[in-house]
């Protein structure tokens, strides 16, 4: 959070019950667009009336040739040949897999609404690598260009950016980047937030982007600011008509960053879905702001859904997971998972502007605010306004919080000027290891909540500036918590994130069950997640968004629990046959090292994902028959294996 620039953070999600008619209609439209209209977004074969262009090939392993680049037998052998050409709609540039090219890649030209330019890979093996020179500002660049599909390349190096897309002229359309690996951007002192690994940002006031897709991108290691940033622009006041629009970031992961993880700034109609961020806010000394993992700022109709943040930090304040920041309208954080953070789980802020129609629903918070400094002033759910800011209409609903702070600090901290007709904190489950459960002004209404305090007999509640020593005293004296309950548990571990409440449904809407198992069941080497995922592949050789999202969630789970002995087995049930080469490349690009993946040709494809958590003796302990979000599977595995062994996770990642 840069208080001088009034910049904090924000977020949103899918499948929401809403409390405001306009809000409900807008988010229903967004969800419908994401689920149906964008099922093929980013696929080169999705465009109708595609203009036929020329295919060009690049093989940097080949020595000097007189190749014209128009066949794999006569490829270009340097990036200079690519950078010198202005490509036309329908053209395609293919870099050979398993090769390295050195220098910046900046192909010129633009596609058209019916024929994007395609930059991709050919052959078999690892993604082709583009390695920036030590003085290059970026590894890949587009500037004042539009209608580009870029996929299946590894970019490394750059002093300011890994991937940088910008411009100075009007509206630039259709920038789709998919299946990229971007890493090791190291330069001098970080100057602004429009820097880092993947940055798609206007270069001038009045310039913006429309139709941006960042899909299946893994980005890590930078001493610049951002993991993935879309929007922004350091221009002061920017009218809403000049904000970027129709932006999707999905199935992506960022980690080991000086600043923010995944952020949307000045965006209309934005989505961050099935993505993850960790080791954010690693800057040693604060210089330009205080980061969070995943958030939005100055965003209208933006959603953060089914995403995960952990091991977040900050050189100052914030250091949280998710945040609906000031200047946002109709933003949501839904069905997401925040755990083991230095700062808060979820915040909603207002400063200088009105933050309107915010929804925080169905999220899971475990082991947040590990910093005593941050725990004291933030809590797990943090509502705050300053500089005459206002929050208008806010719903905090059906979230589960496991709160074990390093001191007697409240799980819920509300210091916000909240106005409007519907400002409800309801149907939440709060497990607090602190006797001080809640500290709120009287601007919020509390009802139908379930509170549990652990390890002590009493509880303390602060509401409207008055302190209450029992729950009944608080409920009667404050006139709050109609339909709510409170109980105490002697065992402190009950508040550490063991299980969801028995009466609650799972986040994804179906209660998983314990299954007895057969007497002849096979034993396993350890706790195992077995998942059968229906999938399809496009002509670029990439998995469909739903399958890619489930794979990303399971991969992130395995990254955390591999050192604890977790096994992961995945069966990909392809709806249509694909070449072994394409399938092999797609699996290799996912970097599923240590994960058993199979794709039998004669396997009947299920219509829904099926996932099981299986004990070492072969007993199926939990089973799900639909897309499985990070919170549900994360909690289930954590309940049997405990907190991830993060120190060993670091060693295995090296």
Could you say what each language-model-derived stretch is?
Residues 40-44, 48, 60-96, 100-101, ...:
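Acidic Gly/Asp/Thr-rich repetitive segments characteristic of extracellular carbohydrate-active
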Residues 608, 616-654:
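Thiol-/selenol-based redox modules, centered on thioredoxin-like
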């Amino acid at each position: 959070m840069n208080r001088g620039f009034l910049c904090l953070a924000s977020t949103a999600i899918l499948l929401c019950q809403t409390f405001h008619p306009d809000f409900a209609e807008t988010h229903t439209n967004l969800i419908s667009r994401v689920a149906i209209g964008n099922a093929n977004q980013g696929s080169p074969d999705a465009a109708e009336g595609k203009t036929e262009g020329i295919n060009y090939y690049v093989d940097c392993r080949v020595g000097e040739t007189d190749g014209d680049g128009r066949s794999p037998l006569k490829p270009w052998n340097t990036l200079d040949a690519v950078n010198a050409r202005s490509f036309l709609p329908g053209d395609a540039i293919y870099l050979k897999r398993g090769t390295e090219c050195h220098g910046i890649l900046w192909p010129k030209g633009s596609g058209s609404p019916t024929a994007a330019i395609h930059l991709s890979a050919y052959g078999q093996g690892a993604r082709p690598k583009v390695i920036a020179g030590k003085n290059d500002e970026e590894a890949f660049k587009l500037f004042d260009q539009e209608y580009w599909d870029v996929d299946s390349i590894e970019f490394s190096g750059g002093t300011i950016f890994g991937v940088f897309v910008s411009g100075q002229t009007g509206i630039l359309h259709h920038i789709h980047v998919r299946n990229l690996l971007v890493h090791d951007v190291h330069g001098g002192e970080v100057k602004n937030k429009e820097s880092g690994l993947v940055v798609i940002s206007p270069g001038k006031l009045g310039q913006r982007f429309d139709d941006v897709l960042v899909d299946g991108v893994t980005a890590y290691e930078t001493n610049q600011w951002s993991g993935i940033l879309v929007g922004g622009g350091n221009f002061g006041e920017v009218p809403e008509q000049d904000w970027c629009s129709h932006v999707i970031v999905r199935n992506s992961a960022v980690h080991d960053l000086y600043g923010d993880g995944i952020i949307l700034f000045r965006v209309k109609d934005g989505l961050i879905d099935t993505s993850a961020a960790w080791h954010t806010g690693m800057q040693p000394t604060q210089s330009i702001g205080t980061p969070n993992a995943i958030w939005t700022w100055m965003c209208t109709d933006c959603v953060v859904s089914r995403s995960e943040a952990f091991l977040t930090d900050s050189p100052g304040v914030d250091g949280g997971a998710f945040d609906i920041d000031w200047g946002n309208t109709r933003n949501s954080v839904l069905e997401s998972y925040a755990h083991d953070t230095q700062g808060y789980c979820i915040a909603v802020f207002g400063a200088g502007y009105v933050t309107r129609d915010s929804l925080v629903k169905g999220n899971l918070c475990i082991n947040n605010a590990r910093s005593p400094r941050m725990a004291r002033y933030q809590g797990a759910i943090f509502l705050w306004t300053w500089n005459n800011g206002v929050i208008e209409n806010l719903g905090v609903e059906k979230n589960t919080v496991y709160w074990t702070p390093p001191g007697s600090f409240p799980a819920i901290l509300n210091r916000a000027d909240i106005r409007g007709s519907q400002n409800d904190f309801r149907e939440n489950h709060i497990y607090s290891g602190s006797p001080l459960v809640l500290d709120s002004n009287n601007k919020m209404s509390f009802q139908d909540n379930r509170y549990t305090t652990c390890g002590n007999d009493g509880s303390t509640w602060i509401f409207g500036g008055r302190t209450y020593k029992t729950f009944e005293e608080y409920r009667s004296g404050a006139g709050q918590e109609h339909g709510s309950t409170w109980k105490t548990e002697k065992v402190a571990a009950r508040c550490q994130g063991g299980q969801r409440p028995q009466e609650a449904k799972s986040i994804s809407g179906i209660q998983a069950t314990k299954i007895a198992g057969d007497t002849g069941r096979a034993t396993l080497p350890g706790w195992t997640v077995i998942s059968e995922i229906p999938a399809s592949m496009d002509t670029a050789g990439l998995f469909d968004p739903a399958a890619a999202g489930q794979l990303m969630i399971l991969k992130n789970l395995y990254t955390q629990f591999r050192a604890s002995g977790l096994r992961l087995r995945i069966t990909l049930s392809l709806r249509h046959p694909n070449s072994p080469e394409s399938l092999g490349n797609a699996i290799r690009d996912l970097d599923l090292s240590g994960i058993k993946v199979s794709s039998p040709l004669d396997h009947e494809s299920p219509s829904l994902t099926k996932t099981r958590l299986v004990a070492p003796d072969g007993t199926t302990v939990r089973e799900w028959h639909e897309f499985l979000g990070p919170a549900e599977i994360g909690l289930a595995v954590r309940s049997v294996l405990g907190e991830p062994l993060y120190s060993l996770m670091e060693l295995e990642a090296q």
